[in-house]
């Protein structure tokens, strides 16, 4: 099995293995829905020049069962009426995941009001970390726009990841390494 062979060959890290290609997960991007060469990214044999990872976390036996309970939901925000967005979040509040990833527009923009912020706070109080990222595959969140003030007030985690696979892996690492939303928020931006 290619993926298992790679575990022995490459240093500790997070990778994506697919159809005999191995790329750094931080850079992985799904580029085709049906082709076997479906992912793009920095080859695992090449060094990463943009390192945004936290210190390594060694997975232990008890982490495997904990990982099976990991619940992460990624919500691509659409140009819906704000009241519909709030209704969607209220539905999620009924059975919140551990992590809710909100994919904003462009640089991470998202229409908000007090009701939406209250839904986010309700999710956080229920043990759900809320992360804001962008739907755009390259670039990232840009704090020059109005998103910074409400994200600080709502205590939202801003993604510092290179892609969705990297973001998922980082959320899983936080879940395994720490136990509460407060800890996830406190350690999210810990870098080497």
Predicted regions and their residues:
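Accessory alpha-helical/coil subdomains and C-terminal extensions
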Residues: 15, 21-113
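Residue-level signal for alpha-helix termini/capping positions
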Residues: 8, 93-94, 124-125
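ATP/nucleoside-binding phosphotransfer catalytic cores, i.e., glycine-rich phosphate-binding loops
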Residues: 114-192
């Amino acid at each position: 099995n290619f993926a298992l062979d790679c575990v022995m060959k490459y240093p500790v890290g997070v990778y994506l293995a697919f159809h005999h290609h191995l790329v750094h997960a931080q850079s992985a991007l799904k580029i085709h829905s049906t082709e076997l060469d479906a992912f793009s990214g920095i080859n695992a044999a090449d060094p990463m020049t943009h390192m945004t990872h936290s210190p390594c976390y060694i997975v232990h036996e008890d982490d495997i069962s904990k990982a099976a309970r990991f619940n992460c939901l990624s919500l691509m925000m659409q140009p819906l009426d704000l009241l519909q967005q709030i209704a969607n979040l209220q539905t999620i509040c009924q059975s919140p995941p551990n992590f809710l990833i909100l994919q904003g527009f462009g640089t991470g923009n998202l229409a908000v009001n007090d009701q939406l912020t209250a839904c986010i706070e309700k999710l956080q109080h229920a043990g759900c970390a809320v992360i804001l990222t962008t739907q755009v595959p390259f670039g990232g969140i840009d704090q020059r726009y109005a998103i910074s003030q409400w994200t600080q007030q709502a205590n939202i985690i801003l993604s510092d990841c290179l892609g969705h696979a990297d973001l998922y892996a980082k959320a899983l690492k936080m879940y395994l390494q720490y136990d509460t939303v407060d800890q996830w928020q406190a350690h999210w931006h810990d870098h080497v």
